[in-house]
């Protein structure tokens, strides 16, 4: 918090004084492919039902603090019961509560960077130590044996599948090994799971491992990022612990109404998910073709985004914004992601625009260009 006055700086808890305000530097642009949102929006038929549900919702009343009607619907969808489900204000609240309830001074969280930065951030808020098992800088894949070894020495593990921003899946067999190795809890963040190959979810392990926690969100496949609704599937005692530390009324009545309607109409979102998966394959192929003549590398992904490496990534990001009104996420500042940009898979028109812009902006590849080999 470098901008604080000396008076307030002295009042802030010591372990929080070096934190910065989260500012993704969003800029109004013609095309925003920076935040892994679902750029297709909610299907029209589902949107009409959500609007009807919102109109019937009384905002003068406090919400059900446990979102029980929504919990029941989510439980029915996932083949379990309410006791195994907790709802939160987006996945972020549930991630923070996970570290708040089970982390803390003297405890260690194992993660596998590059990955979602909020894991380490919430660990710092709760004074939880972090053990980092870095991915291979070329393949961006995890060192599974090293991660299992770290899990055996940690209190908590968080693994993302598909991983943000690298896009790779955590094999179910690896999750099984982590659950067996870790003396505490293993969370698998499946925020992008709907875009992944069928059968890749680790939910099938929940009955066998009571230390497994699976995180989901309605922000991605359900196009409800602005509503802020996530949920966790876990053993009942884990759910109880998470419920005990949560803020009261954190999921408001409008979010509960919208989420309940969306989950009931979940089949209507399947065509959009299929379209994004199809576009992801098309954009990946187009980027690989572009890499034949431009300095570019791209990694395959199971999410609704692709990670690319280009020379001068920060400048490319700025020129995309300034010259083409296209916003992508610059990760070149992050350890392990030098010269990397993350591009959300959008509509065909949005994807065509970013492909054309990259073809214009990127330098021609030399005969011995090493970036192409990474793709």
Protein language model annotation of sequence segments:
Residues 233, 307-309, 344-346:
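Short hydrophobic/aromatic beta-strand micro-patches
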Residues 101-159:
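PLP-dependent aminotransferase-like
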Residues 277, 281, 290-324, 373-375:
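Conserved PLP-binding catalytic core of the aspartate aminotransferase-like
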Residues 124, 141-153, 165-186, 190-224, ...:
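Active-site pre-lysine segment of PLP-dependent enzymes
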Residues 68-108, 310, 314:
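Phosphate-binding glycine-rich loop
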Residues 173, 322-323, 333-375:
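PLP-dependent enzyme catalytic core of the Aspartate aminotransferase-like
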Residues 1-61, 152-153:
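N-terminal "arm"/small-domain region of PLP-dependent enzymes with the aminotransferase-like
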Residues 43, 211-291, 297-298:
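PLP-dependent aminotransferase class I/II
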């Amino acid at each position: 918090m470098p901008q604080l006055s000396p008076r307030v700086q002295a009042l802030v808890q010591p372990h929080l004084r070096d934190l910065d305000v989260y500012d993704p530097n969003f800029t109004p642009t013609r095309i925003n492919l920076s935040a892994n949102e679902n750029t297709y929006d909610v299907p029209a038929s589902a949107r009409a039902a959500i609007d009807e549900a919102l109109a019937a919702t009384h905002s003068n009343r406090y919400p059900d603090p446990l979102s029980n009607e929504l919990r029941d619907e989510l439980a029915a969808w996932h083949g379990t019961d309410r006791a195994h489900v907790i709802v939160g204000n987006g996945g972020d609240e549930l991630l923070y509560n996970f570290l708040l309830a089970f982390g803390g001074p003297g405890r260690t969280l194992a993660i596998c960077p590059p990955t979602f930065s909020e894991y380490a951030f919430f660990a710092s808020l709760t004074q939880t130590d972090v053990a980092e098992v870095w991915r291979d800088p070329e393949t961006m894949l995890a060192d599974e044996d090293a991660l299992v070894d770290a899990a055996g020495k940690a209190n908590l593990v968080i693994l993302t599948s598909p991983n943000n921003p690298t896009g790779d899946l955590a094999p179910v067999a690896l999750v099984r090994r982590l659950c067996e190795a870790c003396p505490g809890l293993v969370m698998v963040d499946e925020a992008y799971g709907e875009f992944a190959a069928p059968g890749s979810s680790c939910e099938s392990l929940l009955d066998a491992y009571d230390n497994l926690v699976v995180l989901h969100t309605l922000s991605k496949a359900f196009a409800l990022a602005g509503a802020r609704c996530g949920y966790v599937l876990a053993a009942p005692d884990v759910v109880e612990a998470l419920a005990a530390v949560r803020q009261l009324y954190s999921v408001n009545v409008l979010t509960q109404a919208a989420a309940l309607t969306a989950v009931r109409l979940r089949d209507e979102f399947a065509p959009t998910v299929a379209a994004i998966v199809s576009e992801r394959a098309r954009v990946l192929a187009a980027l690989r073709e572009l890499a034949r003549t431009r300095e570019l590398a791209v990694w395959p992904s199971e999410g609704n985004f692709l990670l690319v490496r280009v020379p001068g990534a920060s400048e490319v990001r700025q020129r995309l914004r300034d010259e083409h009104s296209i916003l992508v996420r610059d990760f070149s500042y992050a350890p392990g992601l030098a010269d990397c940009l993350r591009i959300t898979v959008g509509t065909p028109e949005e994807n065509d625009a970013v492909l054309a812009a990259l073809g214009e902006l990127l330098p021609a590849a030399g005969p011995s260009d090493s970036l192409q080999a990474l793709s």
